């Protein structure tokens, strides 16, 4: 995605193909833009070819191809609302009804299944924010036209956008605007835009995106140069990415797709995102200089919280679908499928699956009124997802390990072992499963489960789910604040008061209940 394609120029483009979603090949080509990505001390020449990123990039490309596949049109396409006559992924179209919300859910789930739930920052994730910018554009004044333009670009073109909102864990005891040597801040204003420097961390999958949204979350700011929210193209001069160790590359070096079927293609690299005197064009700026507004872009009427948690709940439900299916297979392979304790643990995993699908459906079927006749996923169900999502994967991991034990480890090291004549008879005999399952059946199933619960990839994914909606403590404390802000707390207090008003020291205050004066021993003893 060229730095020349900004939302303002893109909105006025007349060429039909400039305002439609990319194909998979076009997405891959858009990554060959000279971006500055560093891994293991070397600059990556082409992320689409490098073994640390190439299959994960192709996993994203498959999403774009699915969008263009006529077989998926009923689920993955809906007309745009921008007037360009095109189509878009349903989640980029602000919903007006329950039917719209259910269409969003189906589309999110379809893409999530293509990732088995293990890529959380797919292109539709950022529809959670940009999908509402047209409706909530006035919040971004004096940059409201930029917000509208970004909404149109995202809906019509569906570029892949990461976000970087977390400050490096440096000098956490100081206000953010007192850490100017590290945190994102504006150094200068020019006719061309803002000159920005600083860093953000855990910019998930940013090496493979077209743009990065940069925002601020945290305590209120005092210095206006830190109050900045914007979107920047990944090929912009001054944008630098330092990638963490690649699980995809490790899988390629030490195994095969049979051995690492998830990490080898679904590794969202959580990178360090650095701006080194980068120029942010004015048309890409959403907030600047307003110390109060800079921390509110995700709140108020933005709809972002409801929408991204709806996306997250649906994706997590898909992930647990896979885990539950693998567990049903694994315990049968182990021959323990009729053991009561094992059944209880597998049943609990299915219960988590049912919980998150129920929360996702509740968000869709009970939407809250929004702006201009639009609706949002139900807020109370969204908040419930926020709390329970941080608990689910640690508990599911424990349930899998408790049920399968050493079966998760009792595996040969590489797919090549099965192609080695001296080993194959031994593997077929000693690694076979129960109930007619072959050694290959057993090893294939348990290797995927090991990737989910025991590998480095697994550890990252568990931490991802625990941190997905922010601090676990914040999720719980803010639930009280949200209840107070929405009137729920008053309603709950009122209900408790009404329940207690049904009786007092003299007994029942409800006339059709009988006081126990005729049978109460204490009352008789005092007479």
What are these regions (language model features)?
Residues 1-78:
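Acidic/polar, glycine-rich intrinsically disordered N-terminal extensions of enzymes
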Residues 163-312, 484-526:
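FAD-binding core of flavoproteins
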Residues 311-369:
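Extended amphipathic alpha-helical segments enriched in small hydrophobics
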Residues 343-347, 375-383:
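Short, charged, amphipathic alpha-helical segments
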Residues 79-211, 216-240:
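Glycine-rich flavin
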Residues 54, 58, 152-155, 195, ...:
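Generic structural signal for well-ordered, non-transmembrane alpha-helical segments
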Residues 166, 332, 358-365, 394-401, ...:
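Charged/polar positions within long, soluble alpha-helices
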Residues 380-524:
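Alpha-helix capping/hinge segments and adjacent helical runs
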